[in-house]
């Protein structure tokens, strides 16, 4: 994962985990830093995701320089990008058609306008209509997109509204319902016009912030979404995650969705603009720090977490707790960043219960669907 502009973004979502991380310098990722990182990769196949902050803030010229480095890499490379979509325009799509035609573009949008209320600008103004313009433009250009929906309290009990609002957009072919299971997370006190909203939602970084849900609430939302997706036979229109991955997992098949994959966070490596290298970007920094382009000796060292034995111990301990669980083969350990946040909070068992609840619901529905 390449953090092109670091934490810099053109909006200020209340729940953004990237803006909770320490960033000593405001930098853009430079070609020479990427080149050093690619040297560490040693020609192995790479699935590169352009991320931020907002990756489009880097601009077309600088992104073109980074694409040139990726094209010169000795191994196979696929590229995807996660954006809020606000800066996406015809010029950007022309650029991608020219520089990396098969790039996969994901857009973040929390369902309908009501659900998207935590995705605001720096004055707490809504961003929904700016994003939907990008979805319409993508359809006009014949491009498909995946949408990540963060399941906050704003959309609990409204799964049908959320899915119906997204299904109206021709470009949307994948919808991923991502949990917002924040607990004991501290928001940085940025001097922005909407800092008061963050202080109200998350005053002291203790317990559950105002946007988050419990694992059980998330499970109920997922089941509600699955029922609506099935009843409307929308599986022919768009893929709904995590259910595609749950079905594959129940069938003993691999999936790329980390939460239901045997390949966990160590298989995700994040490059920051200043050359720092971390594990999955969903893990907090500096706790997930693995080194830098100047200190790392190779990708094997990074993937095995040799440079951060404490992180390796913590993640291994979580997976060890799965031994003997009736759902171990289908659950595959869940999302380790969420489980780490819940350690010692009393929510550990509820997290596992949510996983079993969702898996059992899907498993029971499969014979009927067949």
PLM ranges: what are they?
Residues 1, 45-49, 78-80, 104-106, ...:
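Structural preference for beta-strand elements that scaffold enzyme active sites
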Residues 1-103:
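Conserved alpha-helical substructure of the radical SAM core
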Residues 2, 93, 97, 101-113, ...:
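Non-cysteine beta-strand/loop elements that form the S-adenosyl-L-methionine
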Residues 4-6, 54, 83-87, 109-111, ...:
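Short, flexible loop/turn elements at secondary-structure junctions
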Residues 19-24, 118-125, 340-342:
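Short glycine-enriched, charge-decorated loop/helix-capping segments at active-site entrances
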Residues 32, 119-132, 136, 140-265, ...:
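Radical SAM enzyme [4Fe-4S]-AdoMet core and its adjacent flexible, acidic
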Residues 62, 77, 97, 103-106, ...:
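Internal, well-ordered domain-core segments that constitute the primary functional module
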Residues 276, 282-370:
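Flexible mid-to-C-terminal extensions adjoining Fe-S/redox cofactors in radical SAM and related proteins
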């Amino acid at each position: 994962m390449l953090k092109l502009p670091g934490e810099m973004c053109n909006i200020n979502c209340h729940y953004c985990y990237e803006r909770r991380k320490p960033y000593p310098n405001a930098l853009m990722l430079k070609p020479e830093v990427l080149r050093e990182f690619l040297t560490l990769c040693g020609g192995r196949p790479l699935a590169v995701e352009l991320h931020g902050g907002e990756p489009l803030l880097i601009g077309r010229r600088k992104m073109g320089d980074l694409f040139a480095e990726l094209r010169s890499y000795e191994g196979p490379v696929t590229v995807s990008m996660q954006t809020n979509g606000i800066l996406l325009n015809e010029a950007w799509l022309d650029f991608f058609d020219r520089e990396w035609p098969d790039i996969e573009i994901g857009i973040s949008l929390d369902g309908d306008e009501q659900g998207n209320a935590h995705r605001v600008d720096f004055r707490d103004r809504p961003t929904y209509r700016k994003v939907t313009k990008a979805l319409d433009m993508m359809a006009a250009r014949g491009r498909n997109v995946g949408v990540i929906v963060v399941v906050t309290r704003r959309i609990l009990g409204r799964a049908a509204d959320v899915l119906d609002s997204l299904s109206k957009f021709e470009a949307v072919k994948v919808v991923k319902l991502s949990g917002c299971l924040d607990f004991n997370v501290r928001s940085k006190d940025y001097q922005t016009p909407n800092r008061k909203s963050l202080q109200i939602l998350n005053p002291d970084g203790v317990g559950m912030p105002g946007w988050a849900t419990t694992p059980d609430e998330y499970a109920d939302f997922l089941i509600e979404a699955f029922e609506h997706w099935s009843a409307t036979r929308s599986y022919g229109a768009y893929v709904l995650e995590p259910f595609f991955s749950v079905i594959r997992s129940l069938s003993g098949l691999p999936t790329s969705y980390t939460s239901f994959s045997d390949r966990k966070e160590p298989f995700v490596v994040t490059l920051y603009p200043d050359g720092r290298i971390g594990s999955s970007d969903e893990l907090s920094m500096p706790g997930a720090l693995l080194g830098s382009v100047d200190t790392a000796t190779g990708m094997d060292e990074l993937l095995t977490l040799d440079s951060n034995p404490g992180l390796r111990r913590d993640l291994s301990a979580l997976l060890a707790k799965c031994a003997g669980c009736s759902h171990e083969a289908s659950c595959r350990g869940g999302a380790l960043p969420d489980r780490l946040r819940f350690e010692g909070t009393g929510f550990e068992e509820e997290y596992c219960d949510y996983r079993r609840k969702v898996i059992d619901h899907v498993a029971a529905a499969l014979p009927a669907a067949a």
